[in-house]
Amino acid sequence: MTITRRLPLAASLLCAAIVLGAADRAPFTFPRSTPEAQGISSAALLGFIDAAEKQVDALHSFMLVRHGQVVAEGWWSPYAADEPHVMYSLSKSFTSTAVGLAVAEGKLTVDDLVLGFFPDSVPADPSANLRAMKVRDLLTMSTGQHDEDIQNFPYLADENLVKKFLALPVAHKPGTLFVYNTPASYMLSAIVQKVTGQTVVDYLGPRLFEPLGIKPPVWEASKQGISLGGFGLNIRTEDIARFGQLYLQKGMWQGKPLLPAAWVEAATSRQMSNGSSTTSDWEQGYGYQFWRCRHGFYRGDGAFGQYCIILPQYDAVIAITSGTRDMPGVLNLIWDRLIPALKPAALSTDKASSDRLASKLSGLMLPAQAGEPTSAAAKSAVGRRYTLAPNAQTAESIALDSIDARGEAAFTIRTAGADQHLVAAPGAWRKASMTINGVAEPVAASGGWTADDTYTLKVARYRTPFVITYSLRFAGDQVVVDTEQNAGFSEPGRFSQWVGRAQPAATQGSK
């Protein structure tokens, strides 16, 4: 199904009424229910969680909504229910929603030509393919551009990114070839901003976020002040579930339409072929910034396992955040473990399994670093500041300030002229703050001695998918720090090494 015309005036007036009425609604919260009351066994959910912990490295949160009620929810500490998590490309589905709302308000159509929105950024001699590119082609990632031409798009550059996009080669007729295209999502955001006078995040405020009870989120923007569109949104797990429930209900929310059902149908249908494999959930077709899945489901997803999965046949929504390199593995677990357990009617009460599930969900924890509380090297390392050779992370020095009998260790890492303090202990997480890439963010640390000369420090950036492991090897006056990250856009493994030497005793603590 496609949408080619502006909706009539009545629909536009309806959208305006929705915006005006958003502030009058009571704050929304999902009702909670037992799994059995909604047709799924607690034992099956427990089996899914156990399998995920063994097979996926690692889920950060999980929420299952059935018949409009939350039947299971859990966060692996230090990740928490009230903390936002970066969405990566799951942001695209929200950008698509902004386009749908703008279409409903008569501000554009999916058949509008892209060049028409940006007359001042059109190349001197635009190709026929560029001239033919429509909003629909941006939505379906069928712009006609080659992958190598959109790689390394400079999202945070000073230059005009709209002009940059329009200058890229368009080798194929738009609408004929699927190529995953995050710059196209940026262009959708730019178009929404052009026709509404608001960034996507501000435009969605009264139209989506407020009615769904989503606190005003952070959405990263380009230096031109345009929400990045294809990534950069930060929201909570329950916010993902609410968004999925809106789509499951075909745009209805608390008995009122927020999003036209025709848009929901078009956005989540197969608009573009993206492969022919019957076993890949990345080749079942693509809608308007939504993926089709096997078994007739659909989803929005983001790098390293951020998921909003809608199961219309089962009246269910699954929201997941994670930090994994095995995104297909997460979906396969859901298909294999959860889908067969979704029954059409309520099940008999199973108090024993229900209690075990509740206990499991309340005690979830990301594996903390194990280790000994002390070692042979600890005595000589404590209290010394090691000056580091120049490195890409701008880390200048590291010091093990203290360590107690239980192994609780205090570290100071000096980065870009500022001291950052961490406390870590074996088998537990200790929260702190670190400045990473110039931005302060909350983290949690754990650590212990994993060899006589080695202290292993694990730092979870618990609003992101990322966990960084620092292995500090002490030898005399020298320390070598190997750093690894659980997930990233490059191959796994060590991504940097710092080498440092202890300052003379007289200068310890002088900085």
Question: Where is each model-derived feature located?
Answer:
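Peripheral terminal and inter-domain segments
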Residues: A22, S348-K511
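Active-site SXXK
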Residues: L46, G68, H85-D111, L138, ...
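A short, well-structured edge-of-sheet supersecondary motif
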Residues: I49-A80, D315-I318
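Active-site helix/loop module of the DD-peptidase/beta-lactamase fold
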Residues: V86, E105-T143, A167, Q198-I235
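Active-site-proximal alpha-helical segments within enzyme catalytic domains
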Residues: M141, A184-I191, F231-M252, Q306-G323, ...
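A small/polar active-site loop signature that marks catalytic segments
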Residues: Q145-A221
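Active-site Gly/Thr loop motif
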Residues: P216, V264-I318
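Structured C-terminal helix/loop/strand segments within mature extracytoplasmic catalytic/sensor domains
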Residues: G302-A368
